[in-house]
């Protein structure tokens, strides 16, 4: 399984060398930038939370991944269309849905595939219908999240934030129905940390959903997603970062135990005495 993951990753990287070279320049520029804007996902949330996730989780934690707005198309709460569609007149990626949902689904599927290859107990969910009027319908993201969170699953919903000036940036909006854990903390370290009571407490987090805003759907991030030459590597890079954060939260790297230093006996050892008998140079007086 680990071999399959490595081969898949090598294939993606080999097909995208030119793009990755550009990425390297972007990363170097970001490192020198006082704002520290991420070269892939852009700025982190401008509203920063102060919570800390400390609860340890089981190494066999079950993870459920949802695509935000999967059941609310052509109705209130359909998600953002992105700057390309709204401001630049571009055609939607799929006329049945807002661009945000199109990309949410792509990231969800890539994350589930990567996570499984890397040993995570992870699965995705799709309501099977783009518009479900009743939030209490058992097929909606909210209903499924409430049930699975009560069973102890970690429920993560993928989102892209609105474009400027409406959006805030990348980051995790954590659940409100439980104590925050190491996975929440790891995702916040990787993407940013929204206030726990963002907008007074959203419906998803009240039902056990951690909302992961990948970034504002605009600029370089949106351009790389829309460009067929860079689309796959961008999706995989985002999914890879999420998978890394999930793994680190579930199986944190422990500091290696200090090796016991050998005890040094007092006085000269026998080997030293024997050498001195045969090597007068060892008897140097200062």
For the regions a language model picked out, list residue spans one by one.
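Catalytic-site microenvironment of enzymes
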Residues: 2-286
């Amino acid at each position: 399984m680990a071999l399959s993951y490595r081969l898949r990753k090598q294939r993606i990287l080999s097909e995208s060398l030119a793009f990755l070279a550009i990425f390297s320049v972007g990363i170097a520029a970001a490192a020198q930038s006082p704002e520290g804007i991420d070269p892939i996902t852009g700025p982190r949330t401008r509203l920063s939370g102060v919570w800390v996730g400390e609860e340890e989780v089981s190494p066999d934690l079950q993870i459920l991944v949802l695509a935000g707005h999967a059941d609310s198309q052509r109705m209130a709460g359909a998600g953002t269309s992105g700057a390309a569609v709204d401001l630049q007149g571009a055609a939607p990626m799929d006329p049945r849905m807002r661009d945000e949902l199109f990309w949410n689904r792509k990231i969800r599927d890539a994350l589930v595939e990567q996570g499984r290859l890397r040993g995570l107990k992870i699965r995705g969910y799709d309501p099977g219908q783009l518009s479900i009027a009743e939030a209490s319908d058992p097929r909606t993201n909210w209903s499924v999240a409430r049930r699975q969170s009560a069973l102890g699953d970690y429920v993560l919903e993928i989102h892209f934030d609105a474009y400027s000036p409406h959006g805030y940036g990348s980051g995790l909006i954590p659940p409100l129905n439980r104590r925050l854990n190491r996975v929440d903390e790891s995702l916040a370290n990787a993407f940013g940390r929204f206030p726990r009571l963002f907008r007074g407490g959203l419906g998803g987090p009240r039902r056990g959903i951690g909302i992961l805003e990948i970034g504002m759907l605009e600029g370089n991030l949106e351009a790389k997603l829309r460009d067929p030459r860079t689309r796959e590597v961008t999706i995989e890079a985002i999914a890879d970062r999420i998978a890394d954060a999930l793994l680190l939260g579930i199986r944190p790297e422990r500091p290696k135990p200090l090796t016991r230093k050998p005890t040094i006996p007092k006085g000269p050892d026998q080997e030293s005495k024997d050498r001195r008998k045969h090597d007068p140079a060892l008897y140097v007086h200062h």
